[in-house]
Amino acid sequence: MRVDLFDFELPEAAIALRPASPRDASRLLVVRPGDPLADRGVRDLPALLSPGDALVFNDTRVIPARLSGIRHRAGGSGQRCEAMLHLREAPDRWRAFARPAKRLAPGDRIRFGSEGASEVCALSGLDATVEERGEGGEILLRFDLSGPALDEAIAGLGALPLPPYIAGKRPTDAQDTTDYQTVYAREPGAVAAPTAGLHFSDALLAGIDAAGIERVHVTLHVGAGTFLPVKADDTDAHRMHAEIGILDAATAARLNAVRARGNRVVAVGTTALRLLESAADPDGTIRPFSGATDIFITPGYRFRAVDALVTNFHLPRSTLFMLVSAFAGLDTMRAAYAHAIQSGYRFYSYGDASLLFPEGAPVSESIT
């Protein structure tokens, strides 16, 4: 499909630079194809679902994946550089997006720290070798540290990887370390937050439990590729970067039981949805999954594992807007986004939320 079909005018002021406070005070737009749009609040979610439905949360935890350092090369002067980690390939190896990538070559050494200051790195020992340089600024780094020691060094020297549409407008601060993490995050490894989950407070989770709605956790370590723009003119020419996901056998059995009794599986966020769809058979049976997925969902895709989706408002021409357009229909989503913009909904990672039902959902699934 042509990428420009997913373009729309988004006022810059609509991009939220801070989340709602408290986090469950966000607005919620309910979108069901064929029904009028409904302006609600995230706190209404327990009343909008049915007892026995299951909300599927991505419990990945964001790590401070943005590293600054100095490139060292024999016979040359140092060059400042930045690496945004996005995919761990081994205990001592990460794929990263580098700036300026053109100044890096295989064999280069990088010392990471406070702009590469040696006194900082003497404490952390965080040095790396560039093993590969790929397309789009991607490099493969082999660190001198490995496993938990590397994790500890990254935690001490890295910075929170706020999306560029936020980080370009204001500096990251201490509040972001709380705001840009879900309250249920427990599996370190993401370099971007599963942002639909940012709306859920402990109080809202208690309300979900009280309403008889199941809470299920899966893990997809969100990569920095989620920030990348689609540069191709056609969706067929775009390739997603792989992300690592885990869905165990007990979780698969729980979710299959939910649907077998006639209830719905509701994904909290596009990351949870992408993992569920990656784990599902053509007949909708969810299987255990552990590994990489690069699933790219565009209109025409037949959804197998997800009956509803909680998600934020996404940017024009993004793979995420393509996904929600595949789920609820392109015309439906264009109309919903036009309403959201006109009504002052806040967009992107720190913005408001929507509850989407798929095209062709039976009338019995309608909500009030």
From Swiss-Prot:
Q: Which key words tag this protein in UniProt? A: Cytoplasm, Queuosine biosynthesis, S-adenosyl-L-methionine, Transferase
**Molecular function terms, GO-annotated:** S-adenosylmethionine:tRNA ribosyltransferase-isomerase activity
Q: What does the record list as coiled-coil region(s)?
A: none
Pathways per UniProt: tRNA modification; tRNA-queuosine biosynthesis
Q: Which GO terms describe its biological process?
A: queuosine biosynthetic process; tRNA wobble guanine modification
Q: What is its EC number?
A: 2.4.99.17
Which region is the signal sequence?
A: none
Q: Name one Pfam family in it.
A: Queuosine_synth
Write down any Gene Ontology CC term: cytoplasm
As for family, the record states: Belongs to the QueA family.
The protein depicted here goes by the name S-adenosylmethionine:tRNA ribosyltransferase-isomerase
**Which species expresses this protein natively?**
Methylorubrum extorquens (strain CM4 / NCIMB 13688) (Methylobacterium extorquens)
Q: Which gene encodes it?
A: queA
